[in-house]
């Protein structure tokens, strides 16, 4: 199956997943690719485009693409079905709940990933627990709780909070939805990366010309690896130059 064919699976899942916003139902739609004409002229380049993820499901971040596909894929796997064949209505049906019971998804986050997991669990009528490291913003905690999750800020750093989350999951039979992999834990992070590819597919279809350079944030590496993998599969040896960047400090 081609890269675009594989990625249509992720978009099919998103298209079938409607969510409540402002009292109505709004379906998935691609976020805009904005052309920054003036900045391109200032820099002396022909075109400059930026993917504006502030519109993504009203959550102001792309992270929900990964969490939603990972949780959907987990449920499909538990049912022994292909996610291609699972509509949103079936995912939230009484039949599925009777087969699987109520699942609890747990994660460590400093903000957007946890909010995406909480949002998805809420829409799929499941439970979410989110732990945030010491120093996390109170506003982000509030945003996660607003999505129906049990969430709190710990007195530990990120790595220790992650270990605490893992211990709780093992003790209680909860499902970890983390965007980083470690020995023995690779399937869910891979699903998350596959979900991120939705954004790459959108950009590929929106671009009027083949890009020459792509700039991506480093983060934990999931987005960078996902988008690079997508364009490498599309363009092969003529893949655009990719730069992985992070803000100073």
Q: What annotation goes with each model-predicted range?
A:
Residues 1-249:
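PLP-dependent amino-acid enzyme catalytic core
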């Amino acid at each position: 199956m081609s890269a675009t064919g594989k990625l249509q699976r992720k978009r099919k899942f998103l298209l079938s997943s409607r969510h409540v916003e402002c009292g109505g139902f709004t379906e998935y739609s691609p976020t805009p690719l904005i052309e920054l004409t003036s900045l391109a002229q200032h820099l002396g380049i022909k075109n400059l485009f930026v993917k504006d993820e502030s519109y993504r499901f009203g959550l102001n971040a792309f992270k929900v693409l990964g969490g939603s596909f990972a949780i959907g894929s987990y449920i499909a796997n538990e049912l022994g079905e292909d996610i291609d064949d699972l509509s949103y209505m079936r995912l939230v049906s009484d039949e599925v709940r009777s087969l699987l019971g109520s699942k609890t998804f747990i994660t460590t986050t400093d903000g957007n990933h946890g909010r995406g997991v909480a949002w998805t669990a809420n829409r799929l009528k499941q439970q979410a627990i989110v732990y945030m490291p010491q120093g996390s913003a109170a506003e982000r905690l509030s945003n996660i709780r607003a999505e129906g999750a049990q969430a709190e800020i710990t007195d530990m750093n990120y790595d220790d909070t992650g270990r605490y989350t893992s211990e709780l999951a093992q003790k209680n039979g909860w499902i970890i939805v983390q965007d980083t992999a470690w020995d023995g834990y690779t399937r869910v992070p891979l699903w998350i990366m596959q979900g991120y590819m939705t954004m790459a597919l959108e950009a590929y279809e929106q671009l009027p010309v083949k890009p020459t350079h792509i700039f991506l944030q480093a983060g934990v590496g999931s987005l960078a690896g996902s988008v690079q993998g997508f364009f490498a599969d599309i363009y092969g040896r003529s893949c655009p130059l990719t730069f992985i960047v992070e803000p100073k400090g």
